[in-house]
Amino acid sequence: MNQNFAAIILGGTGQVGGAVVAELLAIPECREVVMVTRKPMTARSRVRNVVLDTGAPDFAEQTATLASEVFSQGPASAVSCVGVGSGSMRWSEEELKRLELGVVGAFARGCHDAGIAQFCLLSAVGGTARSRF
């Protein structure tokens, strides 16, 4: 089996992210899925869980360190499935920006700084005419 790429994913525990992880694991060439989460999760084959504080001021740097290690083992892509569901209507604009721009932006910067050139963003922000973004 020729396993020649890895994926580092943020937001892989939600409904959309879980589907992305399942699809990645169905690809024989995917050597590893590295899930960045806020809490430890149950071990799975070909899935590595790395717990990081997404609110930490150095989250981008922590991500860059992790992404560099993943990328050093061969080709890698980054995926963000971070998003907010219908409950987000209760969130302030500042809270939404902190998540969608702050956390996702820091993750993207960290992956880019590590040399990962492919970044996939799955987001519903701005997906409707009523979007606050």
Residues of each region from the PLM?
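N-terminal Rossmann NAD(P)H-binding glycine-rich loop of SDR-like oxidoreductase domains
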Residues: 2-29
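Residues at the starts of beta-strands that form the adenosine-phosphate
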Residues: 6, 31-32, 117-118
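NAD(P)H-binding glycine-rich loop region in Rossmannoid oxidoreductase-like domains
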Residues: 7, 48-106, 110-113
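Short-chain dehydrogenase/reductase
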Residues: 10, 14, 97-101, 131-133
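SDR active-site strand-loop-helix element
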Residues: 10, 36, 81-82, 119-125
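A short helix-coil junction within the Rossmann-fold of NAD(P)-dependent oxidoreductases
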Residues: 27, 110-117
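Short, polar loop motifs at secondary-structure junctions
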Residues: 35-42
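Conserved catalytic-site region of short-chain dehydrogenase/reductase
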Residues: 87-88, 125-131
